[in-house]
A protein has these predicted regions:
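Cytoplasmic juxtamembrane amphipathic helix immediately C-terminal to a transmembrane segment
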Residues: 36, 41, 208-220
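Amphipathic coiled-coil signal-relay and dimerization helices
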Residues: 28, 102-108, 156
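Juxtamembrane membrane-water interface segments immediately C-terminal to a transmembrane helix
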Residues: 16, 30-77, 192
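Membrane-interface helix-start motif
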Residues: 179-197
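Short N-terminal helix-loop-first-beta-strand/juxtamembrane motif that initiates sensory/input modules
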Residues: 84-103, 140-143
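Extracytoplasmic/periplasmic sensor domains and loops in membrane signaling proteins
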Residues: 73-80, 110-151
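Extreme N-terminal signal-anchor transmembrane helix of membrane signaling/transducer proteins, especially
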Residues: 3-34, 193-211
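Short, hydrophobic beta-strand elements of compact beta-sandwich sensory domains
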Residues: 158-183
Length: 220
């Protein structure tokens, strides 16, 4: 308290501003951390939902097979044609592998189709499709994190995918979102928050200056 008394009125007002801005900064950091977590969770949930929706296409063609309308081979081929053409958020796609795991259909890397993909690993040594197959066998569905190149690029980037087993055909359908896209969106929000915070700081500093002058001048 004695320390505060030794401060001038102007210094006290600036101290209030500094404390207020520090608290605002701490609150902003907490909010940004929550935004980051929510953004990641939102992307993961969206991926889960679109995979579940795409799995409905497999169910539809399997229904045609069980009804005798199509042979299994014809039903599977038509289902693959439809799923291979599906896109969302511009370039995001679906692939299908089986439980061995062999690639059944990959729309952006056709050279994988029909091949054993159990040995494919990301730069960290993670056996991508083997882990997906194991997850599908044990839990039926789930999320897998790994690194994989974007379409048209050879550089692996962080990706989180959702995979789901379609048991009648022994297929695993999956789709994923690239984390760098999410990070770019997050940092866009960070910069927006920084500019807003800077604007608030400038306004508050101007107000403190005006208030300090209005108090000090009559006392001089």
């Amino acid at each position: 308290m004695n320390t505060l008394r030794r401060l001038s009125i102007s210094q006290r007002l600036w101290l209030i501003l500094v404390v207020s801005m520090t608290m605002l900064l701490a609150l902003g950091l907490l909010m940004l951390n929550q935004i980051h977590d929510d953004l990641y969770e939102g992307k993961a949930q969206k991926t889960q939902h679109v995979v579940q929706a795409a799995s409905g296409i497999l169910k539809y063609y399997h229904g045609l097979e069980t009804a005798g309308t199509l042979s299994r081979e014809a039903a599977q081929q038509q289902a693959l044609t439809v799923v291979s053409q599906l896109r969302y958020d511009n370039d995001d796609y679906f692939w299908i592998n089986d439980l061995r795991p062999y690639m059944v259909m990959h729309p952006t890397n056709a050279k994988l189709d029909g091949n054993d993909v159990s040995a494919i690993k990301d730069p960290d040594g993670f056996a991508i499709f083997s882990e997906m197959a194991n997850l599908a066998k044990t839990k039926g569905s789930g999320t897998v994190d790994y690194r994989w190149p974007k379409p048209g690029s050879d550089a692996p980037v962080q990706k989180t995918s959702y995979v789901q087993l379609f048991e009648p055909w022994g297929w695993v359908i999956g789709s994923g979102v690239y984390i760098d896209d999410m990070q770019a969106e997050f940092w866009g929000q960070v910069w927006q928050a920084c500019w807003v915070g800077l604007g608030i700081a400038i306004i508050m500093a101007a107000l403190v200056t005006l208030i300090a002058r209005s108090i000090v001048r009559p006392l001089q």
